[in-house]
């Protein structure tokens, strides 16, 4: 059965971030994506200027009411949330999650707790980080912080892989069954590799791939693609190891394609065949 995912995150008209980054790769893996946009901007914010607007929180709820009115909400297998335009949007998203789970008790909530990196040009509204700590985390089935977001969620520093696994299990004690640490950065084993962890109460998997050097301007949307693809693989029944290995390879294919084409925006369309069938392989290690 084809899986249906309600994806609630940002949208850019030009380029790739949020739904504009994740939607096509998720579809290329065989999932139906229902994109619901928290913001519509001309382009992503790392350009330093953009136009567009944040959607009113009620807009999100209204759209989902419309899907419920045609009796299709029970076919939704998961809700994915990413970049929020406001903390109030987060409250509405949790209401949507409750509504989806009432219609389909098997549905999952995947929270990508985007909290902003001012130095990277990713800006989030006041209250969004607090929303994720207090409400998003306990409501989620799967949560996918990067290292900075992991430290905010567990409220202490994380300095190495062992501490990251323990921190992920602290989050699991508060609600989610699965934690993806989608960029270990300085807490990883190696400074010249890109490393991730996938953790449950009784399993922990580590994977690494080469860093792709883009100089000063790193492409945006890598985390959005990573979260979306992981959710698709898990819904399709992949094991933790299989899901982590495929996602790591697929994202690497997008990165090397983007660099080879000398582009700043992720080249998800050009890399589409290698998203579905990656040419590279990276092996996950059980910790």
Curated annotation (Swiss-Prot):
- Role of this protein: Pyridoxal kinase involved in the salvage pathway of pyridoxal 5'-phosphate (PLP). Catalyzes the phosphorylation of pyridoxal to PLP in vivo, but shows very low activity compared to PdxK. Displays a low level of pyridoxine kinase activity when overexpressed, which is however not physiologically relevant.
The record's section on CDD domains has: pyridoxal_pyridoxamine_kinase (cd01173)
Which GO MF terms are attached to this record?
ATP binding; magnesium ion binding; protein homodimerization activity; pyridoxal kinase activity
* Knockout-associated phenotype: Cells lacking this gene and cells lacking both pdxY and pdxK are not auxotrophs, meaning that the de novo pathway of PLP biosynthesis is functional. For PLP salvage, the pdxY single mutant can use both pyridoxine and pyridoxal, the pdxK single mutant can use pyridoxal but not pyridoxine, and the double mutant can no longer use both compounds.
Tell me which InterPro entries the record gives.
PM/HMP-P_kinase-1, PyrdxlKinase, Pyridoxal_kinase_PdxY, Ribokinase-like
E.C. no: 2.7.1.35
Residues annotated for ATP binding in this entry: 112, 144, 149, 182, 209-212
Cross-referenced Pfam families:
Phos_pyr_kin
Q: Which family does it belong to?
A: Belongs to the pyridoxine kinase family. PdxY subfamily.
The main enzyme category here is transferase
Keywords in UniProt for this one? ATP-binding, Kinase, Magnesium, Nucleotide-binding, Transferase
The cofactor required is: Mg(2+)
Pathway assigned in UniProt: Cofactor metabolism; pyridoxal 5'-phosphate salvage; pyridoxal 5'-phosphate from pyridoxal: step 1/1
Q: Which reaction does it catalyse?
A: pyridoxal + ATP = pyridoxal 5'-phosphate + ADP + H(+)
Residues annotated as binding substrate are: 10, 45-46, 224
Protein name as annotated: Pyridoxal kinase PdxY
Tagged with keyword RNA-binding:
no
Q: Name one GO biological process term.
A: pyridoxal metabolic process
User: Quaternary structure?
Assistant: Homodimer.
Q: Which NCBIfam families match?
A: PRK05756.1, pyridox_kin
> Can you name a GO cellular component term?
cytosol
């Amino acid at each position: 059965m084809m899986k249906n995912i309600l994806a609630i995150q940002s949208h850019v008209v030009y380029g790739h971030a949020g739904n504009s980054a994740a939607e096509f790769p998720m579809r290329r893996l065989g999932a139906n994506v229902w994109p619901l946009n928290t913001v519509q901007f001309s382009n992503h914010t790392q350009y330093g200027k953009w136009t567009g607007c944040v959607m009113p929180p009620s807009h999100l709820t209204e759209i989902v009411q419309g899907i419920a009115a045609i009796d299709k909400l029970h076919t939704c297998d998961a809700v994915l949330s990413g970049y929020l335009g406001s903390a109030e949007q987060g409250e509405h998203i949790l209401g949507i999650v409750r509504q989806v789970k009432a219609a389909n008790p098997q549905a999952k909530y995947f929270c990508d707790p985007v909290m902003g990196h001012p130095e990277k040009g990713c800006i989030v509204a006041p209250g969004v980080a607090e929303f994720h700590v207090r409400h998003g985390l306990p409501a989620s089935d799967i949560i996918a912080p990067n290292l900075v977001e992991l430290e905010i969620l567990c409220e202490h520093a994380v300095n190495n892989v062992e501490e990251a696994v323990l921190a992920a299990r602290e989050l699991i004690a508060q609600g989610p069954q699965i934690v993806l640490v989608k960029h270990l950065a300085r807490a990883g084993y190696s400074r010249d590799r890109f490393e991730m962890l996938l953790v449950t109460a009784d399993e922990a998997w580590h994977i690494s791939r080469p860093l792709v050097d883009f100089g000063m301007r790193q492409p945006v949307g890598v985390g959005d693609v990573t979260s979306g693809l992981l959710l698709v693989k898990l819904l399709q029944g992949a094991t933790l190891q299989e899901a982590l290995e495929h996602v790591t390879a697929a994202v690497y294919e997008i990165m090397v394609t983007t660099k080879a084409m000398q582009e700043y925006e992720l080249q998800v369309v050009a890399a589409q065949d290698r998203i579905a069938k990656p040419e590279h392989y990276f092996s996950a290690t059980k910790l």
